């Protein structure tokens, strides 16, 4: 997963193993990785936010593998697992600069629940929530 994280040109501050350990410490979590042959090409990582909500924290697809539906497959697999674990909702944050992600979330019934302003409009943080079941 960190190998993919480091190869994403849009990520100006890639996460480290320490970042992951701090965030996931003692939380129920899920890491999904998509492979092309034996090469990891995409991932989706999330964790339990509270008793009823799962937070989809990180995800990325290597540039040369985008447009193939991999992110959608990971999103749907994550939703299925989260629902099976008994969570009632999934939350995720994105930014205006990730237009494809915003479109995918809206297309899959994620609703905007808040926005955090930024000096540049591309950096506005948008929080989405999807009710499950």
Language-model regions: role of each:
Residues 74, 98-101:
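Conserved short alpha-helix immediately C-terminal to the canonical SAM/SAH-binding motif I
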Residues 91-95, 106-127:
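Conserved catalytic-core motifs of GNAT/GCN5-like acyltransferases
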Residues 52, 88, 111:
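Short acidic/polar active-site loop segments enriched in Thr and Asp
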Residues 1-57, 62, 118:
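Acetyl-CoA-dependent GNAT
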Residues 82-94:
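Conserved GNAT acetyl-CoA-binding A-motif
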Residues 61, 67-80, 107:
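Conserved acetyl-CoA-binding loop-helix of GNAT-fold acetyltransferases
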């Amino acid at each position: 997963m960190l190998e993919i994280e480091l190869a994403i040109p849009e990520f100006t501050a890639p996460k480290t193993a320490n970042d992951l350990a701090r965030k996931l410490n003692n939380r129920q979590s899920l890491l999904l990785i998509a492979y092309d042959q034996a090469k990891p090409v995409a991932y989706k990582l999330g964790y339990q936010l509270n008793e009823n909500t799962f937070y989809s924290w990180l995800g990325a697809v290597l540039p040369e593998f985008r447009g193939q539906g991999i992110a959608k497959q990971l999103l749907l697999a994550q939703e299925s697992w989260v629902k099976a674990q008994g969570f009632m909702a999934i939350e995720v944050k994105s930014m205006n600069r990730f237009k494809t992600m915003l479109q995918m979330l809206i297309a899959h019934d994620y609703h905007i629940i808040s926005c955090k302003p930024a000096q540049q409009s591309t950096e506005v943080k948008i929080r989405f929530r999807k009710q499950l079941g």
